[in-house]
């Protein structure tokens, strides 16, 4: 796995609370950030390895249903801000922390959860 400091992240800053979004923008643990605005496509790009990290603060079922399944089938890792089991997170408004690589995923999940609390 590449170090998180050289990772490409897909982060939807406008779906994060203001303080956390400011922290992600000002002190990113990754090298570069993108956002395309199409959640299913972004999750598929993560599954394909185009993005190393993925973060979204709240998706609706039509946003995440197909893309999260494709990422999971590709061997990717997903969880929510509060729940380790992504599939039992609240269905109507689901946060997503994801990565294809399990080592990067663990680092990213821990960073997100720690920094959301500040």
Region spans (language model):
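An extended, acidic
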Residues: 1-118
């Amino acid at each position: 796995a590449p170090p998180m400091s050289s990772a490409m992240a897909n982060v939807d800053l406008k779906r994060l609370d203001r303080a956390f979004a400011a922290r992600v923008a000002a002190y990113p643990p990754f090298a570069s950030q993108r956002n395309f605005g199409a959640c299913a496509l972004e999750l598929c790009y993560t599954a394909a390895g185009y993005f190393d990290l993925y973060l979204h603060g709240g998706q609706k079922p039509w946003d995440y249903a197909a893309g999260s399944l494709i990422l999971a089938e590709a061997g990717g890792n997903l969880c929510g801000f509060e729940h380790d089991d992504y599939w039992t997170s609240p269905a109507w408004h689901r946060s997503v922390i994801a990565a294809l690589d399990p080592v990067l995923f663990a680092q990213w999940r821990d960073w997100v959860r720690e920094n959301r609390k500040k």
